């Protein structure tokens, strides 16, 4: 009842929006006769006038929307030979209003984007169009560039092939930038690791339009973007844990929970593992690493399946994106799982990595002042878009009514029977000449179908992650007569399948789904490949009780029906009731995934506030006009207080109890200072003396430099310590996040505990930052030829920072690049001529987070 009321309300809300937009469409159409009589030069001049009005602040985007849309449509007609339909104008307005335009396949989403892009690009603040892969970013930018150029805009493209920072800088400087979600996100993280404001490439986050918005903001939202560096850990444990895991047996030694993707050892399994590892207690503190490696090895061997979750290519394990079926090059599983899979597959094991910078897609895209998106399937996740991103979904009517027939699911008892039925259907369609597109849920299943079709001598084409480079050509030809195409998940393909009149007579493209995906949206995308622009088409799913969705989440109702009917081999059941039961199983999984994404976001929101504060400070430090004098002075006072506290000298204590010898030794060790007579001084006098002496020593040293050199050294050292401390803080936060779930056993909310602990860790990080910067600045040694030494030192520091930045590998692991360690008796790299141990190596052991 409640659901009906909600759907009625939502339906009416959508209808109201469409009615409102239709009035706007009439106003845009009324201008068409005005603009189609203008010459090209006059049309360009009319658009240029709008640009001047906006940039001079004389009008708003909303007030010139009708003119901008009408001019863009006229320009598109002349330059691209394509005129925007009325429904496309509605889509453009939804995008401009910061909404998600749900438009069916073949409705021309790529062209719709031009309307909102051109209007918002008039501000001169940059518009980012985000796509799911490099192919689509290149294709869309190049196809639409003539239109944008005609209207006076420059277009930039950001893909994984653009490695040079100068090229990226030029691309981002353009009015309109096309690129992938990963590249935009990583550029943001890399920008916040740069040591010069002029090297930052991305600029401001004004307006973004996300193509295939559900794929990026929903499917990929569980995967954070991570820039990482190596952690030196021994690799033998992975091989040992793998051999132990392979000797343990399912059900006898452990149980598998497929729903939650967890493997639990039983008593027998623990005893066997302890015997194989030759340890007394697998779960003691000293064996914590072994138990962790065993957990990951069990997952690698019994939960992660080759050619479904990953492929082995060129002696490397490459992840397969479960939603798009594409290879996720450069991405790695975290927490040692990737290494466990490498051990299982007997390929080179790469080192584990430590997070240097990270952000989730949710928090990256929420940086934009205005955000919108387009997709063929968004209504099933409308509530999530609204809750997480504050994005409303508008279903745009189709230009021509959809003619496709969506038949009920056919359910078989076993997978073998299901595949035989699919082959029979393909044979029937192939003889008729009707093209068929077969969707599979994994590479493994597409290979099974491939072998069966070869056996029956039916010519066909396979599109899965292994052939992703040829996907556009394969999909384009899927609508020709007699074509049989097998494809893993069709999400985000972005290529239309066009058919001719002969195929229309045969009934159009026939879609066969061999398994229901965990998300209804992916199934709808597969169905949506047929019936574009009013073409005929048919879609039907073939399922079996052995499919993972039905096995893990399916209700007993379906199994009960099958048993009562007493079906013989090869027979199936087909009814609306069964189809609805399958959809209810999908809803269960979607809710699970939603909770998982929400959970990830709740945790990342905590880190996000800290990230914003650190990046804000970093940007202030990068500003050459930033003066650190006051900050350094305050930090010096706090450091002096910290030194007294470490020596157990506290305010209000009697001076006869002060351990002055301990204080002197500590100050000499940490700051390289000799302090004079401190006997009989009270706390305040002692603190004042220490601050004065630190200040005198510092000013005496720095006064030999020019003001600009001094400021630059202070800024670079501050940045160096900030980055080092932030890396350590992220590492500590990672460790905290890994174990925080266990607090639930103590009747405590893990999220509340995480917030408390991370806040305390952040306070510790801030204190350490202040102490370490003061210490570093105090121990800098400047000798003769001050200017030359200072310049050399600045250059050395900058070179080291740049080298560190270049050594970082994007995402989760890569072969580490090791820097040579400076021996204690080597000359100090600062150029002082002293040995390292008595110059910059003198600072003593690091403490706290920097240990």
Curated annotation (Swiss-Prot):
Binding residues for Zn(2+): 828, 830, 839-840
Single biological process term from Gene Ontology: intracellular protein transmembrane transport
Keyword vocabulary terms for this entry: ATP-binding, Cell inner membrane, Cell membrane, Cytoplasm, Membrane, Metal-binding, Nucleotide-binding, Protein transport, Translocase, Translocation, Transport, Zinc
Molecular function GO terms recorded: ATP binding; metal ion binding; protein-exporting ATPase activity
Major enzyme class: translocase
InterPro entries assigned to the protein according to its UniProt record, in alphabetical order: Helicase_ATP-bd (IPR014001), Helicase_C-like (IPR001650), P-loop_NTPase (IPR027417), SEC_C_motif (IPR004027), SecA (IPR000185), SecA_DEAD (IPR011115), SecA_motor_DEAD (IPR014018), SecA_preprotein_X-link_dom (IPR011130)
Any one of the GO CC terms: plasma membrane
Cofactors (names): Zn(2+)
Catalyzed reactions: ATP + H2O + cellular proteinSide 1 = ADP + phosphate + cellular proteinSide 2
Compartments in which it is found: Cell inner membrane; Cytoplasm
Superkingdom of origin organism: Bacteria
Signal peptide positions on this chain: none
Membrane topology recorded in Swiss-Prot or TrEMBL: Peripheral membrane protein
Cofactor binding: number and manner: May bind 1 zinc ion per subunit.
EC number: 7.4.2.8
Family annotation (NCBIfam families): PRK09200.1, PRK12904.1, secA
Family (UniProt): Belongs to the SecA family.
Its biological purpose: Part of the Sec protein translocase complex. Interacts with the SecYEG preprotein conducting channel. Has a central role in coupling the hydrolysis of ATP to the transfer of proteins into and across the cell membrane, serving as an ATP-driven molecular motor driving the stepwise translocation of polypeptide chains across the membrane.
Assembly and oligomerization: Monomer and homodimer. Part of the essential Sec protein translocation apparatus which comprises SecA, SecYEG and auxiliary proteins SecDF-YajC and YidC.
Protein's name in the database: Protein translocase subunit SecA
Origin organism lineage: Bacteria, Pseudomonadati, Campylobacterota, Epsilonproteobacteria, Campylobacterales
GN (gene name): secA
């Amino acid at each position: 009842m409640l659901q009906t009321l909600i759907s009625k309300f939502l339906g009416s809300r959508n209808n109201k929006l469409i009615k409102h937009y239709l009035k706007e469409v009439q106003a845009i159409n009324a201008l068409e006769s005005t603009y189609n009589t203008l010459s090209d030069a006059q049309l360009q001049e009319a658009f240029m006038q709008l640009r001047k009005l906006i940039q001079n602040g004389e009008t708003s985007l909303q007030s010139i929307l009708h003119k901008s849309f009408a001019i863009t449509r006229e320009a598109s007609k002349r330059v691209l030979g394509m005129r925007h339909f009325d429904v496309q104008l509605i889509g453009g307005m939804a995008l401009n209003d910061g909404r998600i335009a749900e438009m069916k396949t073949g409705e021309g989403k790529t062209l719709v984007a031009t309307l909102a892009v051109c209007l918002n690009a008039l501000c001169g603040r940059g518009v980012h169009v985000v796509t799911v892969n490099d192919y689509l970013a290149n294709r869309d930018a190049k196809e639409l560039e003539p239109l944008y150029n005609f209207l006076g805009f420059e277009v930039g493209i950001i893909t994984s092939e653009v490695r040079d920072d100068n090229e990226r800088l030029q691309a981002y400087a353009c009015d309109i930038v096309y690129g992938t979600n990963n590249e935009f996100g990583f550029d943001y993280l890399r920008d916040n690791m740069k040591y010069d404001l002029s090297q930052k490439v991305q600029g401001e986050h004004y307006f973004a339009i996300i193509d295939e918005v559900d794929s990026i903001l929903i499917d990929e939202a569980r995967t954070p973007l991570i820039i990482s560096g190596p952690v030196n850990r021994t690799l033998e444990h992975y091989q040992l844990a793998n051999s132990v895991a392979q000797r343990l047996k399912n059900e006898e030694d452990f149980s598998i929970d497929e729903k939650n993707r967890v493997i639990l050892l039983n008593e027998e399994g623990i005893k066997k593992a302890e015997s194989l590892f030759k340890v007394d207690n697998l779960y003691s503190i000293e064996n914590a690493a072994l138990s962790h490696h065993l957990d990951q090895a069990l997952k690698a061997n019994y939960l992660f399946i080759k050619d479904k979750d990953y492929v082995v290519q060129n002696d490397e394990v490459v992840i397969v994106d479960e939603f798009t079926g594409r290879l996720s090059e450069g991405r790695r599983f975290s927490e040692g799982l990737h290494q466990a899979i490498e051990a299982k597959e007997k390929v080179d094991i790469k080192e584990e990595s430590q997070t240097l910078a990270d952000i989730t897609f949710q928090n990256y895209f929420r940086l934009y002042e205005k955000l919108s998106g387009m997709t063929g399937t968004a209504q099933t996740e409308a509530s999530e878009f609204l809750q997480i991103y504050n994005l409303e979904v508008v279903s745009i009517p189709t230009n021509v009514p959809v003619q496709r027939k969506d038949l009920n699911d056919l359910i078989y008892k076993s997978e073998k029977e299901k595949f035989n039925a699919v082959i029979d259907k393909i044979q029937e369609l192939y003889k008729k000449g009707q093209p068929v597109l077969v969707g599979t849920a994994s590479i493994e299943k597409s290979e099974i179908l491939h072998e069966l079709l070869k056996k029956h001598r039916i010519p066909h084409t396979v599109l899965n992650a292994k052939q992703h480079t040829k996907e556009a050509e394969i999909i384009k030809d899927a609508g020709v007569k007699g074509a049989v195409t097998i494809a893993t998940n069709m999400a985000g393909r972005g290529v239309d399948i066009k058919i001719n009149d002969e195929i229309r007579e045969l009934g159009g493209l026939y879609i066969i789904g061999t398994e229901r995906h965990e998300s209804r949206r992916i199934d709808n995308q597969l169905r949506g490949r047929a019936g574009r622009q009013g073409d005929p088409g048919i879609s039907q799913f073939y399922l079996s009780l052995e499919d993972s969705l039905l096995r893990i989440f399916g209700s007993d109702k379906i199994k009960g029906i099958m048993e009562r009917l007493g079906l013989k081999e090869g027979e199936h059941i087909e009814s609306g009731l069964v189809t609805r039961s399958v959809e209810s199983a999908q809803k269960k999984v979607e809710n699970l995934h939603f909770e998982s994404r929400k959970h990830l976001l709740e945790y990342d929101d905590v880190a996000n506030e800290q990230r914003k504060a650190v990046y804000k400070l970093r940007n202030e430090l990068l500003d050459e006009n930033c003066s650190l004098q006051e900050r350094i002075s305050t930090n010096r006072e706090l450091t002096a207080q910290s030194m007294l506290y470490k020596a157990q000298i506290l305010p209000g204590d009697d001076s006869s109890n002060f351990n002055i010898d301990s204080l002197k030794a500590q100050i000499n060790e940490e700051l390289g200072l000799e302090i004079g007579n401190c006997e009989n001084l009270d706390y305040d006098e002692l603190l004042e003396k220490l601050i004065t002496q630190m200040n005198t020593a510092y000013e005496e040293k720095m006064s030999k430099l020019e003001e600009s050199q001094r400021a630059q050294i202070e800024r670079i050292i501050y940045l160096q310590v900030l980055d080092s401390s932030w890396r350590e803080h992220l590492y500590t936060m990672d460790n905290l996040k890994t174990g925080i779930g266990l607090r639930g056993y103590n009747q405590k909310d893990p999220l509340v505990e995480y917030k408390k602990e991370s806040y305390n860790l952040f306070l510790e990080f801030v204190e350490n930052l202040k102490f370490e910067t003061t210490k570093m600045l105090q121990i800098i040694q400047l000798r003769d030829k001050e200017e030359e030494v200072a310049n050399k030192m600045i250059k050395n520091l900058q070179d080291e920072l740049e080298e560190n930045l270049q050594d970082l590998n994007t995402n989760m692991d890569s072969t580490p690049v090791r820097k040579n360690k400076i021996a204690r008796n080597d000359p100090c790299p600062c150029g002082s001529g002293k040995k390292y141990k008595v110059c910059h190596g003198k600072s003593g052991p690091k403490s706290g987070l920097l240990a």
